[in-house]
Amino acid sequence: MQCDFRVHQDARLARVYYFTEVWWMFIFKFLEPKMLINSVLFLAIWSSSFAEESSSSDATSNKRAAMGFQDMRGNKNLIPTSLEHNKLSKRTLMDFQDNKDSNAPDIEDNLSHEFEKRAPMGFQGMRGKKGYLTPDFEDSYFRDEKRAPMGFQGMRGKKVVSDDDYYKRAPMGFQGMRGKKSLEEVLGEIEKKAAMDYYDTRDKKTYVFEYPEDYEKRLLASIRGKLKEFPMEWEKRAPMGFQGMRGKKSLLDEIEELEKRTIMGFQGMRGKKNALENYIDYYLDPDMDFDKRAPMGFQGMRGKKDSDKRAPMGFQGMRGKRNTGQRFDTGINFNIRSSNEYQGTNNRRNALASCQLEKRSPFRYFEMRGKKNPRWELRGMFVGVRGKKWATAPYEDDSPFISVFDNTERIGVDGDSPAILGNSIS
């Protein structure tokens, strides 16, 4: 753009020179000497004024940006849009409008070194980099000058370090901060502050005048001499007020809470009981129930159930082994013993044995998980329950007992029946 403008100026100067030459030739041929002098003066004045006008136009074109205000945030697109083309066509001459499309890359190259992202002077508080006119050694000086030297300093940035009289916490009041404080330090601070009537901390509002004048004196009179009355554990926290800070709890309070807890009620907590006491009780009396939990309350936790809490009769088909020696005698008559318990219970609740034999399931139902106590009429019909088979060690010498178990496989095959087997035994 600048090159085309200069070419256009050169064309205008060529026209002016041609016009002046023609004018001189006309003067020398047709005018008198007086008029010759006047015409020479006129041409000199006119040419000088034209030269000044052309130089001023060059200066203004160099000082001013090519188009538009370019002080906005971010980079501007150097390729001219349709609106910028229209504005440019109004400002430039008619000769320049014919070549505006072909001169777009030349405009971008010529203005790239003049186009800056920010204004060269004035306020530079926009987003982006700092001004290049500011030297490095003056950065610290300008940084300190940007914030207020006094007053409210709650802005973003660093605080002024020169304020030595500025305290970070209140001189009195709530002392529930993190950490431990000695009682002697607290009382010493109160005594020092009570000697002064007014605390001037940078013209801050204090609440001294809201209380009576002799309030602190009466407070000190009530506190002095009572340091030894406090227990030693109070030295680690504030003497009064909210004490919910981090630290240890009083041992007496913990003992009181333990006494209030687990006296009665729900005792279904996981844990072990004192193994020594249980072992001694079991060693002295093995038949006694081995209690693993508190004697009362809800006891639905993991582990064994108390024998008093078990169902005294009913279906006992739990997984496990049954003690055949406790259930039947080793004799031929298969007398039913009084105990109806599992292995290791040693004949408990003998009085309930007769009732347990009457509460069994009806005939011909043997499909449940576990073992039932069958009646004598059906004792040889179904043996396929979970668990081990009948033990043979105590009955090796009893030939009728062995023959009964040998004939169980032939029931219903050769016309045998439980009655026939019973007659053969008797």
Curated annotation (Swiss-Prot):
Modification type Arginine amide: residues: 127, 156, 178, 246, 270, 302, 319, 369, 386
Disordered: annotated span: 299-329
Prosegment location in residue numbers: 1-116, 131-145, 160-167, 182-235, 250-259, 274-291, 306-308, 323-358, 390-426
GO biological processes: neuropeptide signaling pathway
Any GO CC annotation of this UniProt entry: extracellular region
Main location: secreted
UniProt keyword Secreted, yes or no: yes
Tissue: Tachykinins (TK) are expressed throughout the nervous system. APMGFQGMR-amide is also expressed in the retrocerebral complex (at protein level).
Subcellular location: Secreted
Keywords: Amidation, Cleavage on pair of basic residues, Neuropeptide, Secreted
Family: Belongs to the tachykinin family.
Protein function: Tachykinins are active peptides which excite neurons, evoke behavioral responses, are potent vasodilators and secretagogues, and contract (directly or indirectly) many smooth muscles.
Name the record gives this protein: Tachykinins
Highest classification ranks of the organism: Eukaryota, Metazoa, Ecdysozoa, Arthropoda, Hexapoda
